[in-house]
Amino acid sequence: MAFEYPDFVQRVLLHDEALHRPLPTDPPNPEMIIRIREANDDEILPESGLRNLDLLPLLRGGLFYFHDSLTDAIRMVDSVPGALGDYWRQMVFRRMGEFEVARTYGRRAGELPPFQLMLRMAADDSPNMSKQSSWDSYLLAQLYEQYRFGDADLEVELRGLQRVEFDQIYRYTFRQAVGE
């Protein structure tokens, strides 16, 4: 069986302008943010006997994150305890430019199951990440910090890394939420 997100989630993730800026200041598509806010829970995580509603804030927060609405994203992901919630907080705070906070949450999250796949997916396009033995959120925070303080050459690499990271962490979160 092929993996598929619910229709609403698929439509939200189809936007080419999303997730382009490593350090966004505001969402480029405010209408999409409104649609995410107004979506009912079943549009994001369909009803099933195995679904884990505790992870729903991460899924909705992930959609906000994807569309650069980081304030909305942190409001959602902040309520979820555990390693996966910590990793999402790390992702959001890093893109907000709160690098020390991001590193702290990254350390708390530890290593998650998708990390080896993420490393393999990113290795060809990221000279920095390819030197690591596993996906390294601490290194990623350092690269974002370098970018923020003037290393514009990192932008393309960071865009690729954040895309791989988002795709795999969102997918992992969704699979956990549906009981796979």
Write out the residue ranges for each language-model feature.
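Solenoid-repeat scaffolds in large eukaryotic assemblies
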Residues: 73, 102-105
